[in-house]
Structure formats: structure tokens, C-alpha cells
Amino acid sequence: RFPKFKREMSRRRVTTDSVLLGLERLLLGLASIVIVANWALRRALEMVQASMASEPVFFQHWVSGCFEWLQIFFSFGGYSAVAIGLAKIAGITIEENFNAPWRASDLVDFWRRWHITLSSWVRDYLHGPVSAHFRWPATGALVAMIAMGLWHDFSWYYLGWGLWQGLGIVL
């Protein structure tokens, strides 16, 4: 990873185009965070929850979970866009962090498309070596997903979340 970054830094050039493209990406990222994630989706969820008061609790939680996923995507995607935009303004091109995760055909494909920078690092430095050491890819997948869970928060909840994701990939 460092050689690629070093090469990108040596090619770094600030141009009018890079500044304009960077500003566009930065503004789209801020709009994604402020308008979509923090305002529109929250208001929409409040309205949906109010209208679902008589629906089964499971359905209410399922709909709330879908809104939470959208809110995380637009918030995190927005922050990633802000970082990409700031880098572009400085003449640096950095990796995209999302590639249409909603188009994923399965859980493995989802993790190739969601939080690409973390997923690829975990794949290269945990999943690959652990799978090679134990000669069983399932072990690598479980260790990788548990590590990703614990990366988000060192707690029982995220340990379980990582295990759940790992089992979903293995099975």
C-alpha cells in the first residue's frame, strides 16, 4: 500500500480541474451528511415510525434497521467523499471507499463494495495470511470479520456482529 501512496504523492499536482473536482466532491459529501443522513432520513424515519404504531414490532424494527443502514451509508459515504474531495483539492487521488454496495449479489460481494479501504486491508493482512496458515479459508474469513467488528468497537456486541458476518460469509 505504501508504494502506491508514495507514487501518488510524487505525481501530486494541484490544477484548476483538481480543485474544482475536489470542491464538487467535498460539497456532495457535505450534502450527503447534512441534508440526507442527518436531516431527510431522520425526518422520514420519524414519519414512518409514527404511521407504523399499529404494525407488528418486528416489522417496525426491520423498517427502522433499513433506515439506519441508509443513514450509515449516506453519513459514512459523505465523510469518505469529503476526504476524497479534500485530497483532490491538494492534487492527490485516493481510493473510493464504496462501490454501490446495494448492488451486491451476496455477503462477500457486499464486503468488496462497502468500506473498501478497511475491507481490502483486512483481506490482505488478516484473511489471506490466516487462511494460508490454517489452510482453510473459513478460518481466515471468521478472524477477518471478527477483527472488523472489534475495529468498530471493542465490545461484546461488535464481537458478536463480526462473528455473525463471518458465519454469513462461511456458510
Task: Put a short name on every predicted segment.
Residues 1-171:
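Membrane-embedded transmembrane alpha-helical bundles that form the catalytic cores
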